[in-house]
Amino acid sequence: MISIKGTGRFLLDNYRIWQRRAFNRPIQLRKGYKVLAIETSCDDTCVSVLDRFSKSAAPNVLANLKDTLDSIDEGGIIPTKAHIHHQARIGPLTERALIESNAREGIDLICVTRGPGMPGSLSGGLDFAKGLAVAWNKPLIGVHHMLGHLLIPRMGTNGKVPQFPFVSLLVSGGHTTFVLSRAIDDHEILCDTIDIAVGDSLDKCGRELGFKGTMIAREMEKFINQDINDQDFALKLEMPSPLKNSASKRNMLSFSFSAFITALRTNLTKLGKTEIQELPEREIRSIAYQVQESVFDHIINKLKHVLKSQPEKFKNVREFVCSGGVSSNQRLRTKLETELGTLNSTSFFNFYYPPMDLCSDNSIMIGWAGIEIWESLRLVSDLDICPIRQWPLNDLLSVDGWRTDQL
């Protein structure tokens, strides 16, 4: 007779065997497969469903939903409020996405942002995705957020262009990085910021000038472009050139953006312009334009220095990606193509950007990156993975939790 204690041990051992077999089971591909993608690295709760109906064509987007935390009154993102926002919105958004895509019973792969990002925000999406992976007995891929930005320009051509190797300027509110990518799992960081990101700097400068919203830099760009010639051209700001490669600062292959905020405040004080709301629009437009130009000039100058100081790395590189929230800025795109497209031996002939609606954080890029990871590397994630606050792209596969999914 088997004792209750022995029965419990027997059931537990058999459950563990089933669990190992179930979650080490490879993806059983039909002709195609469907992907549920989740992104919660900052203040956007994003859910999408992609139909990978064929490996020879770009996936169809069956659903794409986003709900952004309203942080206008706070003047910035409060991590605890972002965490609560994700907890409140991730369930309803996922339910809507599954209904819209008619995929409630047909999800084959779950892709979710693992990092980098705000730990509380990341955990909201990652914990939810792991729960679904257990409930549905489906494989999980914890995706690098910046890899999503880097790869999303490839989705429209089903990964055909840009072809590896290529370089990427990843510009957002949390990152400013120049990367050389030789393969999906081979990335070299060539230039990174030593303080804040370009999007953060532009947002804070915009806030100093009285702009409001959840995307302040974009509001400032719109204001500048309303009438680019309606400026006070006599109003000249003294703007910095951070980490300039002078005799005392050789080979400073880094970005720095905090100085622009300080410089703007100093200029406003010198000009006696402390009450922004009292300034004429043409003066505000002139100040905003000069700030934006100075920030973008800094990026261009640093990119030129990287390209000229290490020409051997770019011998066979002729494709340039610019992605991330700030990549939607048309002035930045124009400056990149004008100034980097004519650099002699390091000229880039092809420039690639995401569609405008996929420049900012979204879950489609997470789903596409997961598709590329699985189809190229045959990798999935363990169920014990945790959020990663800081995760350099060059350490993509060195973190724990990856395993091979054998067909």
Curated annotation (Swiss-Prot):
Q: What is the effect of changing S172K?
A: Severely impairs t(6)A37 formation
Effect caused by changing H145A: Severely impairs t(6)A37 formation
Protein's name according to its UniProt entry:
tRNA N6-adenosine threonylcarbamoyltransferase, mitochondrial
The subunit field of the Swiss-Prot or TrEMBL record says: Homodimer.
| Cofactor: record remark | Binds 1 divalent metal cation per subunit.
Q: Where is the transit peptide?
A: 1-30
Quote the subcellular location field of this record.
Mitochondrion
Alphabetically, which GO biological process terms does the record hold?
Answer: mitochondrial tRNA threonylcarbamoyladenosine modification; tRNA threonylcarbamoyladenosine modification
Q: What is its main location?
A: mitochondrion
A single Pfam family it belongs to is: TsaD
Catalytic activity reads: L-threonylcarbamoyladenylate + adenosine(37) in tRNA = N(6)-L-threonylcarbamoyladenosine(37) in tRNA + AMP + H(+)
Q: Does Mitochondrion show up as a keyword for this record?
A: yes
- What is the name of the gene encoding this protein? QRI7
- Residues that bind a divalent metal cation, according to the entry? H145, H149, D361
**Sorted alphabetically, which SUPFAM superfamilies does this protein's record hold?**
Actin-like ATPase domain
**GO MF annotations for this entry?**
metal ion binding; N(6)-L-threonylcarbamoyladenine synthase activity; nucleotidase activity; tRNA binding
GO annotations of cellular component type: mitochondrial matrix; mitochondrion
Q: Which organism is it from?
A: Saccharomyces cerevisiae (strain ATCC 204508 / S288c) (Baker's yeast)
Other remarks on record? Present with 1400 molecules/cell in log phase SD medium.
